[in-house]
Protein backbone atom coordinates (compact mmCIF):
# COMPACT_ATOMS: atom_id res chain seq x y z
CA UNK A 1 0.00 0.00 0.00
CA UNK A 2 2.82 2.26 0.87
CA UNK A 3 4.58 1.34 -2.30
CA UNK A 4 1.61 2.22 -4.47
CA UNK A 5 1.30 5.58 -2.84
CA UNK A 6 4.97 6.31 -3.47
CA UNK A 7 4.62 5.37 -7.11
CA UNK A 8 1.57 7.57 -7.48
CA UNK A 9 3.36 10.53 -5.89
CA UNK A 10 6.39 10.15 -8.12
CA UNK A 11 4.15 9.92 -11.16
CA UNK A 12 2.41 13.12 -10.11
CA UNK A 13 5.69 14.97 -9.78
CA UNK A 14 6.76 13.82 -13.27
CA UNK A 15 3.45 14.96 -14.68
CA UNK A 16 3.84 18.38 -13.04
CA UNK A 17 7.31 18.89 -14.48
CA UNK A 18 6.10 17.81 -17.87
CA UNK A 19 3.19 20.23 -17.68
CA UNK A 20 5.38 23.14 -16.69
CA UNK A 21 7.79 22.46 -19.55
CA UNK A 22 4.87 22.22 -21.99
CA UNK A 23 3.51 25.59 -20.79
CA UNK A 24 6.85 27.24 -21.34
CA UNK A 25 7.05 25.78 -24.82
CA UNK A 26 3.58 27.01 -25.68
CA UNK A 27 4.42 30.50 -24.37
CA UNK A 28 7.59 30.62 -26.41
CA UNK A 29 5.75 29.45 -29.48
CA UNK A 30 3.12 32.18 -28.96
CA UNK A 31 5.77 34.86 -28.68
CA UNK A 32 7.46 33.62 -31.86
CA UNK A 33 4.15 33.72 -33.72
CA UNK A 34 3.51 37.30 -32.51
CA UNK A 35 6.93 38.45 -33.70
CA UNK A 36 6.38 36.83 -37.10
CA UNK A 37 3.02 38.58 -37.46
CA UNK A 38 4.58 41.91 -36.55
CA UNK A 39 7.33 41.42 -39.13
CA UNK A 40 4.76 40.58 -41.78
CA UNK A 41 2.63 43.66 -40.88
CA UNK A 42 5.57 46.09 -41.06
CA UNK A 43 6.69 47.54 -44.44
CA UNK A 44 10.03 49.07 -45.29
CA UNK A 45 10.32 52.83 -44.88
CA UNK A 46 11.30 53.14 -48.51
CA UNK A 47 7.81 51.95 -49.52
CA UNK A 48 6.17 54.80 -47.54
CA UNK A 49 8.73 57.55 -48.18
CA UNK A 50 10.50 58.31 -51.41
CA UNK A 51 13.10 61.01 -50.69
CA UNK A 52 13.70 61.76 -54.35
CA UNK A 53 10.02 62.27 -55.18
CA UNK A 54 9.45 64.33 -52.02
CA UNK A 55 12.36 66.66 -52.67
CA UNK A 56 11.22 67.13 -56.29
CA UNK A 57 7.67 68.02 -55.19
CA UNK A 58 8.93 70.48 -52.60
CA UNK A 59 11.22 72.09 -55.15
CA UNK A 60 8.39 72.55 -57.63
CA UNK A 61 6.18 74.12 -54.96
CA UNK A 62 8.92 76.51 -53.93
CA UNK A 63 9.69 77.69 -57.45
CA UNK A 64 5.97 78.00 -58.26
CA UNK A 65 5.54 80.23 -55.21
CA UNK A 66 8.50 82.32 -56.27
CA UNK A 67 7.03 82.76 -59.76
CA UNK A 68 3.70 83.85 -58.26
CA UNK A 69 5.49 86.39 -56.06
CA UNK A 70 7.36 87.80 -59.06
CA UNK A 71 4.04 88.20 -60.91
CA UNK A 72 2.59 90.10 -57.97
CA UNK A 73 5.56 92.46 -57.89
CA UNK A 74 5.32 93.01 -61.64
CA UNK A 75 1.64 94.00 -61.26
CA UNK A 76 2.42 96.86 -58.89
CA UNK A 77 2.54 95.20 -55.47
CA UNK A 78 5.58 96.26 -53.55
CA UNK A 79 6.88 96.03 -50.05
CA UNK A 80 7.96 99.37 -48.59
CA UNK A 81 9.88 100.06 -45.47
CA UNK A 82 8.03 101.78 -42.64
CA UNK A 83 8.73 105.50 -42.62
CA UNK A 84 10.59 107.08 -39.76
CA UNK A 85 9.08 109.82 -37.60
CA UNK A 86 11.14 112.47 -39.35
CA UNK A 87 9.97 111.39 -42.80
CA UNK A 88 6.36 111.24 -41.62
CA UNK A 89 6.60 114.80 -40.27
CA UNK A 90 8.11 116.04 -43.54
CA UNK A 91 5.31 114.43 -45.57
CA UNK A 92 2.64 115.92 -43.27
CA UNK A 93 4.24 119.38 -43.48
CA UNK A 94 4.32 119.20 -47.29
CA UNK A 95 0.64 118.21 -47.46
CA UNK A 96 -0.29 121.07 -45.12
CA UNK A 97 1.73 123.54 -47.23
CA UNK A 98 0.01 122.40 -50.44
CA UNK A 99 -3.44 122.67 -48.85
CA UNK A 100 -2.66 126.18 -47.56
CA UNK A 101 -1.44 127.26 -51.01
CA UNK A 102 -4.65 126.02 -52.66
CA UNK A 103 -6.75 127.80 -50.01
CA UNK A 104 -4.99 131.13 -50.64
CA UNK A 105 -5.41 130.79 -54.40
CA UNK A 106 -9.13 130.15 -53.94
CA UNK A 107 -9.54 133.19 -51.64
CA UNK A 108 -7.60 135.47 -53.99
CA UNK A 109 -9.78 134.33 -56.89
CA UNK A 110 -12.93 135.19 -54.93
CA UNK A 111 -11.57 138.64 -54.05
CA UNK A 112 -10.81 139.24 -57.73
CA UNK A 113 -14.43 138.37 -58.58
CA UNK A 114 -15.74 140.80 -55.96
CA UNK A 115 -13.55 143.59 -57.36
CA UNK A 116 -15.20 143.19 -60.76
CA UNK A 117 -18.77 143.06 -59.35
CA UNK A 118 -18.83 145.94 -56.84
CA UNK A 119 -19.97 149.14 -58.62
CA UNK A 120 -18.52 151.82 -56.33
CA UNK A 121 -15.26 150.24 -55.20
CA UNK A 122 -12.46 152.80 -54.70
CA UNK A 123 -9.66 150.94 -52.92
CA UNK A 124 -8.52 147.50 -54.05
CA UNK A 125 -7.17 146.08 -50.76
CA UNK A 126 -8.96 143.15 -49.14
CA UNK A 127 -10.29 145.11 -46.16
CA UNK A 128 -11.90 147.72 -48.45
CA UNK A 129 -13.35 144.99 -50.68
CA UNK A 130 -14.96 143.25 -47.69
CA UNK A 131 -16.35 146.51 -46.29
CA UNK A 132 -17.83 147.55 -49.64
CA UNK A 133 -19.30 144.06 -50.12
CA UNK A 134 -21.14 144.26 -46.79
CA UNK A 135 -22.40 147.77 -47.53
CA UNK A 136 -23.60 146.88 -51.03
CA UNK A 137 -25.30 143.72 -49.78
CA UNK A 138 -27.25 145.67 -47.15
CA UNK A 139 -28.21 148.21 -49.81
CA UNK A 140 -29.57 145.54 -52.14
CA UNK A 141 -31.36 143.87 -49.25
CA UNK A 142 -33.15 147.10 -48.39
CA UNK A 143 -34.07 147.61 -52.05
CA UNK A 144 -35.67 144.19 -52.26
CA UNK A 145 -37.65 144.75 -49.07
CA UNK A 146 -39.08 147.99 -50.42
CA UNK A 147 -40.27 146.47 -53.71
CA UNK A 148 -43.93 145.34 -53.67
CA UNK A 149 -44.55 141.73 -54.52
CA UNK A 150 -47.46 142.38 -56.95
CA UNK A 151 -48.40 145.30 -59.23
CA UNK A 152 -50.72 147.91 -57.78
CA UNK A 153 -54.21 148.39 -59.25
CA UNK A 154 -53.57 152.13 -59.50
CA UNK A 155 -50.96 153.95 -61.54
CA UNK A 156 -48.20 155.18 -59.26
CA UNK A 157 -44.59 156.28 -59.46
CA UNK A 158 -41.99 156.56 -56.70
CA UNK A 159 -38.37 157.71 -56.92
CA UNK A 160 -35.62 158.15 -54.32
CA UNK A 161 -31.85 158.06 -53.99
CA UNK A 162 -30.08 154.85 -52.93
CA UNK A 163 -28.42 155.23 -49.52
CA UNK A 164 -27.34 158.85 -49.98
CA UNK A 165 -25.82 158.05 -53.38
CA UNK A 166 -26.74 161.19 -55.33
CA UNK A 167 -25.97 159.58 -58.69
CA UNK A 168 -27.97 156.33 -58.22
CA UNK A 169 -31.77 156.38 -57.99
CA UNK A 170 -34.40 153.72 -57.44
CA UNK A 171 -37.58 153.98 -59.52
CA UNK A 172 -40.68 151.89 -58.83
CA UNK A 173 -43.88 152.29 -60.85
CA UNK A 174 -47.09 150.40 -61.65
CA UNK A 175 -49.27 150.96 -64.70
CA UNK A 176 -51.39 149.17 -67.29
CA UNK A 177 -49.43 146.78 -69.45
CA UNK A 178 -49.14 147.74 -73.10
CA UNK A 179 -46.93 147.05 -76.08
CA UNK A 180 -43.74 149.11 -76.19
CA UNK A 181 -43.97 150.19 -72.55
CA UNK A 182 -40.33 149.51 -71.69
CA UNK A 183 -39.16 151.18 -74.91
CA UNK A 184 -40.98 154.35 -73.84
CA UNK A 185 -39.38 154.09 -70.39
CA UNK A 186 -35.94 153.79 -71.96
CA UNK A 187 -36.52 156.84 -74.19
CA UNK A 188 -37.73 158.85 -71.20
CA UNK A 189 -34.56 158.05 -69.25
CA UNK A 190 -32.42 158.81 -72.28
CA UNK A 191 -34.04 162.23 -72.56
CA UNK A 192 -32.65 163.19 -69.14
CA UNK A 193 -29.31 161.43 -69.76
CA UNK A 194 -30.01 158.65 -67.26
CA UNK A 195 -29.32 154.93 -67.72
CA UNK A 196 -30.87 151.87 -66.09
CA UNK A 197 -28.29 149.46 -64.63
CA UNK A 198 -30.80 146.96 -63.27
CA UNK A 199 -34.48 146.24 -63.90
CA UNK A 200 -37.06 143.95 -62.28
CA UNK A 201 -40.39 143.59 -64.11
CA UNK A 202 -43.58 141.74 -63.17
CA UNK A 203 -46.80 141.51 -65.19
CA UNK A 204 -49.98 140.11 -63.62
CA UNK A 205 -53.54 140.43 -64.94
CA UNK A 206 -52.78 143.21 -67.43
CA UNK A 207 -50.84 145.24 -64.86
CA UNK A 208 -47.09 145.81 -64.93
CA UNK A 209 -44.89 146.61 -61.99
CA UNK A 210 -41.29 147.68 -62.65
CA UNK A 211 -38.35 148.47 -60.36
CA UNK A 212 -35.40 150.27 -61.96
CA UNK A 213 -32.00 151.25 -60.60
CA UNK A 214 -30.88 154.28 -62.59
CA UNK A 215 -27.51 155.99 -62.83
CA UNK A 216 -26.80 159.57 -63.96
CA UNK A 217 -29.53 161.26 -61.94
CA UNK A 218 -27.24 164.09 -60.69
CA UNK A 219 -28.86 165.11 -57.42
CA UNK A 220 -32.35 166.31 -56.64
CA UNK A 221 -32.69 168.30 -59.86
CA UNK A 222 -31.98 165.24 -61.96
CA UNK A 223 -34.41 163.23 -59.84
CA UNK A 224 -37.17 165.77 -60.51
CA UNK A 225 -36.54 165.68 -64.28
CA UNK A 226 -36.59 161.90 -64.32
CA UNK A 227 -39.85 161.79 -62.35
CA UNK A 228 -41.60 164.18 -64.76
CA UNK A 229 -40.40 162.23 -67.77
CA UNK A 230 -41.50 158.86 -66.39
CA UNK A 231 -44.81 160.14 -65.03
CA UNK A 232 -46.09 160.83 -68.54
CA UNK A 233 -45.21 157.27 -69.58
CA UNK A 234 -46.90 155.78 -66.52
CA UNK A 235 -50.04 157.83 -67.20
CA UNK A 236 -50.23 156.37 -70.73
CA UNK A 237 -48.88 159.27 -72.82
CA UNK A 238 -46.91 158.51 -76.01
CA UNK A 239 -43.15 158.76 -76.06
CA UNK A 240 -43.24 161.87 -78.29
CA UNK A 241 -45.64 163.59 -75.91
CA UNK A 242 -43.45 162.60 -73.02
CA UNK A 243 -40.40 164.03 -74.77
CA UNK A 244 -42.15 167.31 -75.63
CA UNK A 245 -43.55 167.67 -72.14
CA UNK A 246 -40.15 166.88 -70.70
CA UNK A 247 -38.56 169.61 -72.81
CA UNK A 248 -41.28 171.99 -71.69
CA UNK A 249 -40.68 171.01 -68.14
CA UNK A 250 -36.98 171.68 -68.55
CA UNK A 251 -37.71 175.13 -69.98
CA UNK A 252 -40.05 175.78 -67.11
CA UNK A 253 -37.36 174.89 -64.61
CA UNK A 254 -34.84 177.14 -66.36
CA UNK A 255 -37.31 180.02 -66.39
CA UNK A 256 -37.91 179.58 -62.70
Curated annotation (Swiss-Prot):
CDD domains: bHLH_AtAIG1_like
Matches recorded under Pfam families: HLH
Record keywords: DNA-binding, Nucleus, Transcription, Transcription regulation
Stored InterPro entries: AIG1-like, bHLH_dom, HLH_DNA-bd_sf
Main location: nucleus
MF (Gene Ontology): DNA binding; DNA-binding transcription factor activity; protein dimerization activity
Organism superkingdom: Eukaryota
Keyword Zinc: no
SMART domains noted in UniProt: HLH (SM00353)
PROSITE patterns: BHLH
Gene3D superfamilies, per database record: Helix-loop-helix DNA-binding domain (4.10.280.10)
Any one Gene Ontology cellular component term annotated for this protein: nucleus
Residues annotated as domain bHLH: 91-140
Protein location: Nucleus
Oligomer status and interactors: Homodimer.
Name under which the protein is recorded: Transcription factor bHLH131
Lineage: Eukaryota, Viridiplantae, Streptophyta, Embryophyta, Tracheophyta
